[in-house]
Amino acid sequence: MTEHFDARGTRDAQTGRDLHSFIAGLPKAELHVHHVGSASPRIVSELAARHPDSSVPTDPEALADYFTFTDFAHFIKVYLSVVDLIRTPEDVRLLTYEVARELARQQVRYAELTITPFSSTRRGIDERAFMDAIEDARKSAEAEFGTVLRWCFDIPGEAGLESAEETVRLATDDRLRPEGLVSFGLGGPEIGVPRPQFKPYFDRAIAAGLRSVPHAGETTGPETVWDALTDLRAERIGHGTSSAQDPKLLAHLAEHRIPLEVCPTSNIATRAVRTLDEHPVKEFVRAGVVVTINSDDPPMFGTDLNNEYAIAARLLDLDERGLAGLAKNSVEASFLDAAGKARIAAEIDTYTAAWLAP
């Protein structure tokens, strides 16, 4: 079972106020959240009903058991079964729009959504139609909810170098590249998928103006994080959990202000970390590393971004000002323009000041 921490009933010692309510209204940015992994049980059920040849349950309650993982390999297997439900441009648009709706519900003002276009194009969705679907959903969501979405196109590591070539082509072809694309990533399993082999693809993406944000150190040691930094020129690290095992790496991350995209519940659900109390986020903060809090694949892990902030509040002993600072970390670590960063940071400050006013 995935561990959870609910801040309802948790009172800040100085203000006596409910941190859960503060978190619920806090303006936020999210930097590590997956497109398909954000499909709610309702949307997964709807897609499974559209495609009855799938093994994915159509009953939302049955999905809770389906989304209980024994290890990271099992998680990948289940994740890919949900990926297989995305078969048409309308599926893509529906999913993207509904993910934005859920982010807006949590007061997420800006999100960089990790999308794996290779998984859709290899299943027969037309490249242009795929790009049009995500862009149409992005623009509609911003107009209706006020949430700004940007894209990270990532390589599915389990699919090998063919997927790397296809992903970088889609990301750098000016005839296809979507307006919202800002970064280039690498996800999937780490064991048996060495990061250095992806260097040529990241070099091409970076040359085309994209930012480097690979997963590393989630289920392997700190050497994978070093590889991401040296070979893939990572500007942020997805997870980076094992960085805590290497003091020199922690010092490097802190000195160079390279943020970690920390996803506590995800790490427990995939067995990357045994318990929340053993999560290394405390060590990251003590070492001066920039920490951002994220939800990864929230419905699959039975969480959301608000719950991840509640977990951080407990693990790091944060009050409202500390939580506001954590939210501003994500804003500053984002690839939003300076004016956009300043706007959301000011909104966080205004909200916090109003909350704490006598």
From Swiss-Prot:
Binds 1 zinc ion per subunit. Its cofactor is Zn(2+). It comes from Streptomyces avermitilis (strain ATCC 31267 / DSM 46492 / JCM 5070 / NBRC 14893 / NCIMB 12804 / NRRL 8165 / MA-4680). GO terms for molecular function: deaminase activity; hydrolase activity, acting on carbon-nitrogen (but not peptide) bonds, in cyclic amidines; metal ion binding. Its EC number is 3.5.4.40. The active site is at E218. Substrate binds at R87, D154, G188. GO terms for biological process: menaquinone biosynthetic process. This is Aminodeoxyfutalosine deaminase. Belongs to the metallo-dependent hydrolases superfamily. Adenosine and AMP deaminases family. It catalyses: 6-amino-6-deoxyfutalosine + H2O + H(+) = futalosine + NH4(+). It comes from the Bacteria. Zn(2+) binds at H32, H34, H215, D296. Pathway: Quinol/quinone metabolism; menaquinone biosynthesis.
